[in-house]
Amino acid sequence: MSTWTSKIAIVALLSGCATSIPAPDRADLRIEGQVVSIVAPAGFCVDPQSVDVTKAGGFVLFSDCALTGAAGGTVSTAVISASVAPTGLNGTLVELQKFLTTEPGKITLGRSGDMQAITVVESRVVDDVLLIKVDDRGAQPIRGVSPEIWRGFFVAGGRAVTATVSGAAEGGTSDIHARRYLGQLAASTRAANKT
């Protein structure tokens, strides 16, 4: 095997070790040498094509298990994404909440990038999870998605995790369900990362 093909094989092998999906509802992401397990709420499964790890952190997308080909679950139009930072949270959840509800902070919560179109509808810390409901009436980068989303911020395995629940523009996801999904994801993820 030539030197350049050996290097390609090594890179492919190493990149393959960055993620694994040990169960339909779980993705293990190796970030900066540490594995962080992200566990979906009941009825949601990993979209295997979505799992990604870079120097900036990790990402995974969960949707209804019936849509990903796995058995079980009730039909839901919600999609849940989770991003894991390579570091922990700088400061407290209350400090993060204060920043994200300011004009400059709002821009990071929406999708449109239009600060004037983004409104923080609700914000609270429950069970060590910062929950924020966002209404973004700007141009959406993804067609067919509701302008209302819920974001959850928490720490698991020493890493900052940001989770988002999005629903379809028609029908959407109720606030109760969105908060429940974020709470379940945070609790399951924390439990999976206890050392």
Question: What does each model-found stretch correspond to?
Answer:
Residues P147-V155:
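Short, surface-exposed beta-strand/loop micro-motifs that present aromatic residues
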Residues Q34-C65:
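Post-signal-peptide N-terminal segment of Sec-exported extracytoplasmic proteins
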Residues A18-I21:
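Bacterial signal peptide processing site
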Residues A40-A42, S50-D52, P86-G88, V134-G138, ...:
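A mature extracytoplasmic/lumenal domain signature
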Residues A160-T195:
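Surface-exposed amphipathic alpha-helical segments
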Residues L13-G16:
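C-terminal motif of bacterial Sec signal peptides marking the signal peptidase cleavage site
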Residues G58-G144:
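Conserved polar/disulfide-associated segments of primarily extracytoplasmic proteins
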Residues M1-A9:
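Bacterial N-terminal signal peptides that target proteins for export
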